[in-house]
C-alpha cells in the first residue's frame, strides 16, 4: 500500500510517514526490534504514521482490488487562450497478492462495518441511498502503560485519541474513497464516520458529480 513512502501527488511538501521495520528502528532509535512490534505495526500502532491521503489511497486500492492509484490534482494543462497543452492520464500500479480472493474478504468485512448487526459504523446505514463499505478507528496520540486505563476526561485534550473513518462507495462500482480524521475527538464511529456520511451524501445525492 506504499505506507512509509510519498504518494507522488502533484503538490509540494508531502511527507511519506513511517512504516517501521527492524532496520528503521536500528537506524533511528538504535534499539532492537521485538516480535510484538510486528503485530502492532500490522494494525497501525507503534511507530507507524500515515496521512489521511495515504489512508484514502489504501482504501481505494482495496476497493479496486489491488490497483494503487497515484493521486493528482491537475488533470490537464492549457494556455491562457484555452489551448490544451497536455492531458494528464492517471498512473497506477497493481499490488501483488498471493490469493486475489482476499480482496473480496476485506471488502466484505468493510461492508459489514456498515451493514452488519455488530458493525461499528452501522448507524451510517440509516436511509443510506448508496452502498458503502468502511472501517472505523481510533488513533492513539500517546502510549499507556499496561496497568493504566484510558479515561478521556482525565487526559489533556491535545493528548486524547483521534477519531478515524475510512471507506469507499458505491461498493459494486467504486467512485469515491474517503478518509476522515478528527483530532482528539475519540471514537471514530461517533465522530468521524458521521462526517464521512455528510460528505458522501453531498457528493452522491445533493450535488452529484458526473464522471
Predicted regions and their residues:
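Short beta-strands and strand-coil junctions in structured, solvent-facing domains, enriched
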Residues: 186-187
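Short, gly/Ser/Thr-rich active-site loops of penicillin-recognizing serine hydrolases
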Residues: 83-92, 195-211
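Short amphipathic alpha-helical face segments that pack within enzyme cores
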Residues: 51-57, 191-198
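Beta-lactam-recognizing serine transpeptidase/beta-lactamase-like catalytic domain environment
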Residues: 1-177
Amino acid at each position: 500500500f506504499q505506507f512509509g513512502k510519498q504518494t507522488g501527488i502533484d503538490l509540494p511538501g508531502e511527507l511519506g510517514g513511517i512504516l517501521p521495520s527492524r532496520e528503521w528502528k536500528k537506524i533511528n532509535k538504535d534499539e532492537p526490534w521485538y516480535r510484538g512490534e510486528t503485530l502492532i505495526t500490522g494494525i497501525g500502532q507503534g511507530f507507524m504514521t500515515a496521512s489521511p491521503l495515504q489512508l484514502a489511497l489504501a482504501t481505494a486500492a482495496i476497493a479496486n482490488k489491488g490497483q494503487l492509484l497515484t493521486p493528482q490534482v491537475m488533470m490537464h494543462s492549457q494556455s491562457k487562450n484555452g489551448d490544451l497543452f497536455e492531458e494528464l492520464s492517471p498512473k497506477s500500479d497493481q499490488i501483488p497478492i498471493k490469493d486475489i480472493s482476499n480482496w473480496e474478504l476485506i471488502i466484505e468485512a468493510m461492508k459489514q462495518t456498515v451493514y452488519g448487526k455488530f458493525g461499528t459504523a452501522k448507524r451510517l446505514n440509516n436511509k443510506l441511498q448508496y452502498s458503502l463499505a468502511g472501517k472505523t478507528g481510533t488513533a492513539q496520540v500517546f502510549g499507556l502503560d499496561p496497568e493504566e486505563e484510558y479515561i478521556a476526561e482525565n487526559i489533556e485534550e491535545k493528548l486524547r485519541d483521534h477519531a478515524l473513518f475510512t471507506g469507499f462507495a458505491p461498493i459494486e462500482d467504486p467512485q469515491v474513497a474517503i478518509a476522515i480524521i478528527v483530532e482528539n475527538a475519540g471514537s471514530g464511529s461517533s465522530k468521524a464516520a458521521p462526517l464521512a456520511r455528510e460528505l458522501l451524501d453531498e457528493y452522491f445525492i445533493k450535488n452529484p458529480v458526473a464522471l
